[in-house]
Structures are given as structure tokens and as C-alpha cells.
Amino acid sequence: MAVGCNQDDYLHYDTDSASIRFTSSENDSTVYSFRLHPGETEGLIEIPVQLIGLASPQAREISAEIVAEKSNAIENTDFVILHSEIMADSIHGVLKVLVKKTDILDNESRRLTLRLCPNQFFESAPVNQSLYTIVVNNELLYPDGWIFGEYSQVKHEFVILHTGIATDYNSVWTNSEKLWWKSKLIDALYEYNLAHPGDPLKDENGILISF
């Protein structure tokens, strides 16, 4: 687990003038849904960080802590901050966070706000680039690059089941692949409805699914 913030320990070190920051103050959060990862009970989130200062010939540990007043996630139950580093001779790195699927996600989301900490390698991060929020849930949300017409969670689940892809459809497929997959989904829906006479596939609002 990554070392948390401890200002008393930090004061014992003689540091160079270097710090790290999350790479964008405008993109300071992410949502991780286990519904997009069927069968998985853990998920790895890698948050980009960038060095402020000079690269070093040695790897340098990234330290972070949970901001309790902005979080309802419980460390070691809902998440674990993993050992993370700025690698030698690099100005980029990632803060690694392992999130866990728990029963509570069936009823509510877990929110985790992290703060970058000073340590023996780095001074305090800029205030406006020191926080990052992760929201963990077990819901399906409207994905990037949706190309299948009217959206519903039932249709989204059907697409994931048959394509293995949960999001970013515009970027993972070429135009010809999009047409091919739409054709395959139309066939799959036909087969589903054929196997369920009188009970065709409907969305969560009772509307017939179509592609």
C-alpha cells in the first residue's frame, strides 16, 4: 500500500524542490462501474500524475491519503491504494488504486477522494491539482461513443453480452465494424425474441428493444 501523508515524518527529510500533481484540474474525477466489467470483483484505476521539477535517476514513491470528509469509501474494504512510483528518468507516473466490488454497491455508490501527500521525495502538490475523486458503483451509465440509437440499461447490457465491449464504441471499431456489429446485434435480438415467444426483449421502461 502506498505511504499516506505524515507531515511530521516529512519534516525530517531534506528534499529537493520537486513535487507532483494530478495532470488536469479540469478532469479530476472518474466513475468506475462494475456493471461494465461482468464477473470481476476488483478493478484497477490508474490516475496519471506529473512531476513538477527535474527527473531523477532513481524511482520515487507517490504518497496519497483519503480525504475523509469528502469520502464514504472505507480503506481496505472498498479500496486499497497500491504502491506507486514516478519511475527513474521519468516525469510521468500513475497513482494505482484497487477498488473492490462489495454488496453495498447494489444500493449506493462509494465515493473516494484522494489527496497527494508530501514525502521524502516530493513537496506538497499545488492545491488545485492535489485532489482526485473516484466514484465506484454497480450501475450502467450512458457510455462514451454510444451508437445504438435510443439508450437503455437493458439494451446496454445486451450489447455488452454480445460484443464484450462496454464503452467507447466509436474509438474501438471502424465504420465497417460498427455496421457489422449492428447487424450481429439485430440477429441476436431476433434469436432472443424467437426463443421468448410472447415476451420480447424490453427495456426497464417496458419499451421494446430495437437496433
Indicate residue ranges for each PLM-predicted region.
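A glycine-rich, hydrophobic loop/mini-helix early in the fold
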Residues: T77-F79, E85
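Short proline/glycine- and polar residue-rich coil/turn motifs
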Residues: S84-G93
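C-terminal motif of bacterial Sec signal peptides marking the signal peptidase cleavage site
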Residues: A2-G4
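Intrinsically disordered, low-complexity regulatory regions in eukaryotic proteins
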Residues: N6-E61, A68-N76, V94, T102-R111, ...
